[in-house]
Amino acid sequence: MALELGLKGRTALVTGGSKGIGRAIARGLASEGANLVLLARGMDALAVTAGELSTQYGVKALPLAADITKTDSVQAAAEAARAAFGTVHIVVNNAGNPMRRTDRQILWPDTDWIGDLDGKVIGSLRITQAFLPLMPGDGTGRIINISGTASTVVWAPALTHGMNNAAMNQATGYLAHDLASQQITVNTIVPGLVGTEGRQAWADTMAKQQNTTKEEFLAGFCKRMGILTGRWATMEEVADTVLFLASDRARYYTGAKIIMDGGLNVNVRPA
């Protein structure tokens, strides 16, 4: 029996939707017939992505340049989405600042801490608050947050990155409780290491530096990290998890934190 997801004709918002994981999520949703509201800070790549997905899948795709750290910008995006679609069924909070691998983050000025949190967890709350009035109360409303294993594993020295991810996980539970009466489910996907364009480029560089193949470097890296599957996740695998949580098949899931890290969380140690 085919797994019908029931997403055709629904509208999904994806933040950070112009590239990387966000673009893969947007493509997955479009492939299931969902219309799209795509948000990112820059319009150029966003417009290209929206045009490609609209042409390929025959869906409507609205690109909106917006900054999730600015309340006015987020509210303007919500009003544009209302004008275009009226209803937004699915909100995917994917946008976030890149991990900054800087030593001694405790010595940063507090404006840097606040800026990093503003660009992920606080910005995601702004998005949720602004788009909530557009979401239906008929059981099809879905809020899907993207955090990461830095919520539970210390990726030194990425202090604010870990704080952001842990806060996203915790906010999910609170929002699931608050929005249950509106029949809106709220869940978090907790990916481990994902083979984004940037991470693939890093692996290429490291392999060259170590005079080995990329495949050999990645095999050794995953073994050292304790990734039981022996590889990174693909962006499409993250998107597939979003599709399930967005679908009618996930009606009973709320407040969940879906770990997809290839077994990294198992944390195996020799006996």
Where do the language-model regions lie?
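Conserved mid-core segment of classical short-chain dehydrogenase/reductases
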Residues: 75, 98-114, 157-160, 270-271
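C-terminal helical subdomain
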Residues: 125, 188, 211-253, 260-262
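Conserved glycine-rich cofactor-binding loop
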Residues: 11, 18-20
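Catalytic Tyr-X3-Lys loop
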Residues: 89, 109-125, 144, 161, ...
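Short C-terminal tail/terminal secondary-structure segment
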Residues: 2-3, 20-21, 102, 153, ...
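Catalytic loop of short-chain dehydrogenase/reductase
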Residues: 97, 144-167, 172-181, 192-194
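Short, small/polar-rich loop/turn modules that mediate ligand/substrate recognition or access, typified
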Residues: 180, 185, 253-255
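Alpha-helical segment proximal to the catalytic Tyr-Lys
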Residues: 133, 177-178, 251
